[in-house]
Amino acid sequence: LEKRLTPNTKMIVLTNPNNPTTTVMRRESLEKLAQFAVKNDLIVVCDQAFEDSVYDGVEFVTLASLPGMWERTVTVCSISKGMALSGYRVAYIVADDHIMDVYYGSAVSVIGATNTASQLGAIAALKDASFLEEYNRIFDRRRKIVYEIFNSIPGVSMAMPESTFLCWVNVSRLGTADEVNAYIIKEANVVVNAGTPYGAQGEGHLRIVFGAFREDA
């Protein structure tokens, strides 16, 4: 970050837990990031869409909770992703008043509001999030199955997902991400995401969702 910093740098965008790798940033790393942001007077937009789906007792730390960060952090949370209400298209942000004033003065007129039914569904989910316990049990079991399956295939490997209902699969020994993706669609009629849209390091990887609730999924 120090090497990338310029006089024009105003903001850092962070995804934690990460999409697509599922990595959860540890407290020590977040503390260093917070110190960097404070030192250089930067705003941090922190996407925490999957904050409620973290496995194996890994500690999830909200960046805004660290010293000096509340007044410079925009926390983005997603009902659609975090609570498995994908079709609702509902998210919200949490930030200090001075940031919210700027937001309401610009973004609201562009983004608009979601429909009433989605808002009511989101409110119900936030008031009683007890279903997340079962939701995470299901996905915890599935991620272990997915991990075993992909690591048993010659030329394919993946790390155990730390969060979310995603897995980041390394297929670089089989071909490019686009080639493997096209093969899977043709041979199995299954859609996955090639890793290339996620940047140069996404080449040779596939982003796969194991989030369907059907038992035969």
PLM feature segments, named:
Residues L1-G57:
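Active-site phosphate-binding strand-loop segment of PLP-dependent enzymes
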Residues E2-K3, S152, E179, Y183-V192, ...:
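PLP-dependent enzyme catalytic core of the Aspartate aminotransferase-like
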Residues E28-Q35, K39, R141, I145-E148, ...:
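Alpha-helical scaffolding segments of alpha/beta enzyme cores, especially the outer helices
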Residues L66, E71-D140, Y147-I149:
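Conserved core segment of the aminotransferase class I/II
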Residues D97, R173-L174, A212-E215:
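Helix N-cap motif at beta-to-alpha junctions
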Residues Q119, I123, F139-Y147, M158-V171, ...:
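Conserved glycine-rich beta-strand-loop-beta hairpin in the small C-terminal domain of fold type I
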